Amino acid sequence: SGGGEILPDGRHKDEWGVVRVRPEGCHYYELDECPLAGEITPADIARYPWPDPTDPGRFRGLRERAKRLKEETDYAVVFSARYHLVHQTQYLRGFEDWYCDLAGDHDLFRALCDAVLEVMMEMNRRAYEEVGDLVDIVAFGDDVGLQDRPVCSLPMYRKLIRPYQERITDHIRRHTNAKILYHTCGSVYAYIPDFIELGIDALNPVQVSAKNMEPERLKKEFGGRIAFWGGVDTQHLLPHGSPEEVAAEVRRLFEVLGKGGGWVLAAVHNIQPDVPPENVLAMYETGRSCVYETAAAPA
């Protein structure tokens, strides 16, 4: 989340009113206070002080930066959009209450999702006015997977979460011609056919340590219909493996996920301080030495 303030005790309060603390030596902030936790009603949601999506400071210099990348580099221009609806509603309600709403209070669940998405869509619409004609990829992240399962059953996902994701992907296509990159950690194998139907072009981060997220399975079932972005394990391999093991896994991923194209080499998630530098170098140097086995050109 952007904006916010540092509280006297060192915690960070963001523009949504969510308070976080950053543990020593960690690259992540951890949730500490959820402003809409507990017993609330749709009226409480309507009265909540939402961020101002029209604040011009959000967009200052945005077009200039995108234009420079487009005209002066050979990079793809990626816009990191703010459509983290599941995340943000979890942060506002707290995980326990969010799951209770998902299971038993659908009116409240939808009221919060509607309010949050309205703010996010206006933020992004204003951004697209600045850079919608320049971006090659619109990326957004919203975790709907856990280590061993999705956040909810497939029928519940389709009833309560997918309709909002459809509004998001439609919003992106309405304002840009960009490819859509979607980030979700965890075991989301069951949802991938729906992601494809929604028009998502690439899935990140391919958490290979999660259940049913084996690269072979994903490439066999979904290769050619969605691209994969990630796959180098950050839970076990990078922090605990040897440089030789990292290099071997990168080569294997080129053979599996990279076969025929449709894969971007990347670590599954942020590389933490306990990862030996030698392993980071092994990942990048091996990646540079490998070649994608692209699909054969049509005759």
What positions do the PLM features span?
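A contiguous, low-structure linker/loop signature
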Residues: 2-51, 72-75
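Active-site loop segments of alpha/beta catalytic cores
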Residues: 13, 22, 45-299
